[in-house]
């Protein structure tokens, strides 16, 4: 990892050298003020991960941890070319799209007796079986099916070889350190290596690896093997929804040139300068929002129910984006098709 900036260092460096994406200090403060009203409620608590999302596992056992591992291994590229035509999966009487279509497909497979969360199964699962497991209820398939198949096989084999087929063994090797778990994941599983170049420096976002650590912390409710002492070192997860909501809320701004590109729906390739700026500035923006929010909480003498970190802010803003999808229609999100987010 020599000379490689951490996600937080990367974000700060990108924000300081950005040409097309800018953080608005007034907007940062306004978002922090919006979040202040939620600081004492259930929305910014670890319990919300299970309470608000019915597809997430209820348990805190090995099976729940392995569910998290397989969903985050496949947690990338759910955006559709059109809002009208998208991949949708029905489960439990409800229809889901985006990331939740994956969770619904995993739960549907488990209900059908397919052991999709077992490494010994997905290490050798065939492409046709993956197509069946991730099948859409519409004519639009889940994107990147071949990549998902390849990654499942690769990841399953590594989990069997190095960690006895269970992600819980990997978690237990981390000595209750979020950073140690993050490094175990990116060192052992190639598809989690979300690393590129910017201004001559090697930078990392580790979107899926960080969300895997965060979801492990959440599914274990921050207790036992999931009691990570350094959980606040994890940043927001740089994807395509969070930048959109930060622009909508006025905390992030795009240059006219970039905005035009995004409005036209032009693809930005992974590692492209503007794509890196969007992701990096979003991460740094959430770090600044968190700092501002903690300052406001201290000034008001509010009592929060637990430590407020970037993970909980990310969870809240991501849900906010989903709940305000109609209002945000005029704000474009960037189109990048890759396995990292």
UniProtKB/Swiss-Prot annotation:
Natural source organism: Bos taurus (Bovine)
One of the record's GO molecular function terms: hydrolase activity
Record bears the keyword Electron transport: no
Family affiliation: Belongs to the QNG1 protein family.
UniProt miscellaneous comment: Eukaryotes lack the canonical genes for de novo biosynthesis of queuosine (Q), present in most bacteria. Therefore, this molecule must be sourced from ingested food and/or the gut microbiota, and metabolized to its corresponding nucleobase, queuine (q), before incorporation into cytoplasmic and mitochondrial tRNAs. Incorporation of q into the anticodon of some tRNAs contributes to translational efficiency and accuracy.
Lineage: superkingdom: Eukaryota
Hydrolase keyword on record: yes
Catalytic activity: queuosine 5'-phosphate + H2O = queuine + D-ribose 5-phosphate
Gene: QNG1
GO BP term (any one): tRNA-guanine transglycosylation
Disulphide bridges: none
Enzyme class name: hydrolase
Signal peptide (residue range): none
InterPro entries: Q_salvage
Function: Catalyzes the hydrolysis of queuosine 5'-phosphate, releasing the nucleobase queuine (q). Is required for salvage of queuine from exogenous queuosine (Q) that is imported and then converted to queuosine 5'-phosphate intracellularly.
Pfam families xref list: Q_salvage (PF10343)
Residues the record lists as binding queuine: 53, 237, 239, 314-315, 319
UniProt-annotated catalytic positions: 239 (nucleophile or transition state stabilizer)
Modified residue annotations for N-acetylmethionine: 1
Protein name (Swiss-Prot/TrEMBL): Queuosine 5'-phosphate N-glycosylase/hydrolase
EC number(s) stated in the UniProt entry for this protein: 3.2.2.-
Keywords: Acetylation, Hydrolase
């Amino acid at each position: 990892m020599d000379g490689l900036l951490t996600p937080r260092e990367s974000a700060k460096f990108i924000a300081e050298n950005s040409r097309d994406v800018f953080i608005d200090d007034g907007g940062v403060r306004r978002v922090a003020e919006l979040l202040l009203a939620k600081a004492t409620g259930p929305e910014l608590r670890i319990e919300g991960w299970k309470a608000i999302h019915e597809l997430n596992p209820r348990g805190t056992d090995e099976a729940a941890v392995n569910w998290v591992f397989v969903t985050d291994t496949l947690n990338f590229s759910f955006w559709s070319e059109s809002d009208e035509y998208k991949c949708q999966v029905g489960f439990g009487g409800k229809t889901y799209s985006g990331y939740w279509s994956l969770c619904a497909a995993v739960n549907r497979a488990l209900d059908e007796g397919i052991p999709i969360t077992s490494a010994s199964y997905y290490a050798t699962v065939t492409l046709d079986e993956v197509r069946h497991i991730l099948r859409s209820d519409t004519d639009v398939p889940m994107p990147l099916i071949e990549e998902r198949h390849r990654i499942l096989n690769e990841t399953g084999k590594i989990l069997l070889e190095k960690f006895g087929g269970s992600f819980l063994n990997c978690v237990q090797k981390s000595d209750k350190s979020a950073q140690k778990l993050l490094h175990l994941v990116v060192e052992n599983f190639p598809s989690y290596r979300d690393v590129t170049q910017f201004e001559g420096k090697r930078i990392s976002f580790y979107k899926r690896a960080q969300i895997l650590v965060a979801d492990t912390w959440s599914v274990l409710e921050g207790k036992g093997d999931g009691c990570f002492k350094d959980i606040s070192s994890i940043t927001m997860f740089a994807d395509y929804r969070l930048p959109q909501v930060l622009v909508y809320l006025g905390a992030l701004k795009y240059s006219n040139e970039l905005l035009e590109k995004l409005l036209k729906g032009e693809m930005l390739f992974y590692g492209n300068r503007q794509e890196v700026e969007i992701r990096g500035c979003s991460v740094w923006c959430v770090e600044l929002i968190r700092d501002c929010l903690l300052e406001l909480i201290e000034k008001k003498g509010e009592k929060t129910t637990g430590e407020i970190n970037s993970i909980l802010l990310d969870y809240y803003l991501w849900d906010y984006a989903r709940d305000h999808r109609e209002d945000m229609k005029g704000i474009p999100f960037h189109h990048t098709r890759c396995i990292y987010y």
